[in-house]
Design a protein with these regions (language model features):
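Membrane-water interface segments at the C-terminal ends of transmembrane alpha-helices
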Residues: 8-43, 52-164, 188-213, 217, ...
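Short hydrophobic, aromatic-rich alpha-helical segments embedded in or entering the lipid bilayer
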Residues: 45-52, 223-237
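Membrane-helix/interface signature in polytopic inner-membrane proteins
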Residues: 158-172, 180-181
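Key positions in alpha-helical "signaling/recognition" and NTPase switch elements
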Residues: 173-174, 245
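Glycine/proline-centered hinge or cleavage motifs at structural transition points of membrane proteins
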Residues: 177-178, 191
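Conserved acidic donor-binding loop of glycosyltransferase catalytic domains
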Residues: 184-185
Length: 277
């Protein structure tokens, strides 16, 4: 037996738990079970043949490379934006804070069309980058740009609350003891931010793995070059090859779950270490 706290916001523990479990079953477990059922139609040899297909492997490489570059960029830029929004007061700060959520509200197709227009050869950014012989559209770099744009809020919104709770007092105390601003950031602030920053980058990476709408507009679907796994899955579905689509999706799903589980484990160990101190 276990005791349930009497201070409840929602009426009824049984009703709340039942509703939550129903949501988990309908939204998470049923789709995953459908994926498993599709995979069950394939033998191990057929499954291996699908995921080891050279074109599929090329799509995995493009997807992982682009998602990695996008998540690293988001880690740096997202930390910078979170720092600016929490440590400084300036005109337009509220607007800038609201704009950080724009990728969440903007349809990915609209985001992709906008990015394609900006980075095209005649676009605002593309024309300038062309002077340095840098092409973004219909390259893996364009995929990374689309992924970074759609997933940047994960880093900002994960790091920002931690920075607000941390406050500038710790930095000021370190500086009064003789530390430079860079030393106070690296030795005082960054260790406290690391769990949130790593979690934000991991969420950005896993979100990027499944990006579809923005990618297809800025990078197209060029086999061996800009074909990512989400586009390949879409093509397989159009061909009514559901087992093959499920097999390709299962690899990305496994990678995402392993990454998220690893991050949660590291955060849990970090939390126990902090409590132990």
């Amino acid at each position: 037996m276990f005791a349930v706290s009497s201070r409840r916001v929602l009426p009824g523990f049984t009703l709340s738990l039942g509703t939550s479990l129903l949501f988990v079953c309908l939204i998470l477990l049923l789709p995953l079970s459908a994926l498993v059922m599709q995979l069950a139609q394939m033998s191990w040899a057929q499954y291996w043949e699908v995921i080891n297909n050279p074109q599929v492997v090329a799509a995995y490489k493009v997807t992982l490379l682009s998602a990695f570059v996008a998540s690293i960029f988001n880690g740096v830029f997202g930390l910078l934006m979170a720092w600016i929004l929490t440590r400084y007061r300036f005109p337009g700060r509220t607007l800038l804070d609201a704009l950080m959520d724009l990728p969440f509200a903007l349809p990915t197709a609209v985001a992709g069309l906008t990015l394609a227009s900006l980075f095209s050869v005649n676009g605002f950014y593309g024309e300038w980058l062309a002077k340095f012989d840098i092409k973004v559209t219909y390259t893996w770099l364009g995929i990374a740009v689309a992924m970074a744009f759609t997933s940047i809020p994960f880093v900002v919104r994960t790091v920002q609350p931690v920075l607000e709770e941390l406050g500038p007092e710790y930095e000021e105390a370190a500086e009064t003891l003789g530390a430079t601003r860079w030393q106070s950031f690296c030795k005082v602030v960054l260790p406290e931010l690391s769990p949130a920053l790593v979690a934000g980058v991991a969420l950005s990476f896993t979100r990027s793995l499944g990006e579809f709408g923005a990618v297809i507009f800025i990078a197209g679907n060029i086999a061996w070059k800009t074909e990512v796994t989400s586009l390949m899955i879409f093509v397989r579905l159009q061909e009514f090859d559901y087992p093959a689509a499920s097999a390709i999706a299962s690899v990305i799903l496994a990678a995402s779950l392993i990454l998220l589980f690893s991050i949660n484990t590291l955060q849990s160990r970090f939390g126990r270490r902090v409590v132990g101190h």
